[in-house]
């Protein structure tokens, strides 16, 4: 991959309104498609805002009527705001684009970032993002032959079967206490170039998530680096660490197009008798 350029758009009092950053994404996306700029990662904070991906249901929006910006990324509703490091990597990928591989690269960079601050995180089968796994619990006894545990894959509309493999923790079917999401990822690819990206919770006010069903996932919580460590961590501290891991992962990735299964050749017609 080409050298990755970082652009710090604004943090703290200079946080960037979501619609302004979205327009900036579109401009950089067009420039990247035409090869006028290299692969670029926009880094910033937003003022408080809810954004809804294409598959957000009405029941998942804020119950109090708080305004929501509808966007063209995948996934469902989430919140952005102070204390959250947001990154929009705008990269040209080989076609057909392997979106899952791109998501995994972003997850790996954020997993390494969290590890540098002493927070152990993981992927979870079927779910994008970076997670702190819930503590193990003893297997609960069946009641009258009916197990009290459940398989979330049967009820989770967000479960993505492509997100699996040895690097993923198994779905939480009661064997752990509530898993907690540290970083959300939502991607769009247009003309072979990525948009949108990740949001890493550093030290936000997590009560903003109480008004919605974050990412459409009802059986998990939300956390932050500060909450997990029990001390204040700032976006300013995390920014250079995240940049280092994003550069290392994204610049050194061996990009390959998505494997496409070839149609099987038709069996030859039987010879006439």
UniProtKB/Swiss-Prot annotation:
Keyword Acyltransferase attributed: yes
Swiss-Prot/TrEMBL keywords: Acyltransferase, Cytoplasm, Transferase
Enzyme nomenclature, EC number: 2.3.1.181
Pathway named in the protein's UniProt entry: Protein modification; protein lipoylation via endogenous pathway; protein N(6)-(lipoyl)lysine from octanoyl-[acyl-carrier-protein]: step 1/2
BPL/LPL catalytic domain segment(s): 35-254
A Pfam family of this chain: LplA-B_cat
GO biological process: one example: protein modification process
UniProt catalytic activity: octanoyl-[ACP] + L-lysyl-[protein] = N(6)-octanoyl-L-lysyl-[protein] + holo-[ACP] + H(+)
Residue numbers binding substrate: 73-80, 184-186, 197-199
Active-site residue list: 215 (acyl-thioester intermediate)
Cellular localisation: Cytoplasm
GO MF assignments: lipoyl(octanoyl) transferase activity
Stated family: Belongs to the LipB family.
Remarks, miscellaneous: In the reaction, the free carboxyl group of octanoic acid is attached via an amide linkage to the epsilon-amino group of a specific lysine residue of lipoyl domains of lipoate-dependent enzymes.
Name of protein: Octanoyltransferase
Species, as recorded: Streptomyces griseus subsp. griseus (strain JCM 4626 / CBS 651.72 / NBRC 13350 / KCC S-0626 / ISP 5235)
Taxonomic lineage: Bacteria, Bacillati, Actinomycetota, Actinomycetes, Kitasatosporales
């Amino acid at each position: 991959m080409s050298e990755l350029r970082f652009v710090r758009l604004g943090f703290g009092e200079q946080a960037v309104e979501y619609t302004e950053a979205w327009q900036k994404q579109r401009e950089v996306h067009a420039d990247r498609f035409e090869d006028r700029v290299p692969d670029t990662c926009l880094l910033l904070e937003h003022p408080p805002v809810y954004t809804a991906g294409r598959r957000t249901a009405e029941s998942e929006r804020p119950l109090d009527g708080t305004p929501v910006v509808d966007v063209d990324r995948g996934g469902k509703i989430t919140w952005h705001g102070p204390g959250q490091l947001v990154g929009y990597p705008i990269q040209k990928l080989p076609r057909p684009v392997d979106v899952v591989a791109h998501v995994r690269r972003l997850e790996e960079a954020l997993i390494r970032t969290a590890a540098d601050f002493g927070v152990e995180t993981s992927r979870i089968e079927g779910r994008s993002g970076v997670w702190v796994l819930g503590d193990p619990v003893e297997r609960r006894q069946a009641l009258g032959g009916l197990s009290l545990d459940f398989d979330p894959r049967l009820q989770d509309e967000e479960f993505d079967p492509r997100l699996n493999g040895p690097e993923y923790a198994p779905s939480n079917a009661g064997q752990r206490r509530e898993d907690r999401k540290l970083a959300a990822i939502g991607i769009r690819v247009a003309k072979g170039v990525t948009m949108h990206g990740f949001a890493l919770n550093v030290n936000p006010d997590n009560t903003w998530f109480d008004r919605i069903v974050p990412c459409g996932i009802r059986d998990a919580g939300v956390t932050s680096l500060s909450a997990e460590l029990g001390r204040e961590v700032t976006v300013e501290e995390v920014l250079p660490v995240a940049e280092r891991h994003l550069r290392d992962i994204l610049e050194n990735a061996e990009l390959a197009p998505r494997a496409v299964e070839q149609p099987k050749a038709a069996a030859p017609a039987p010879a006439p008798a």
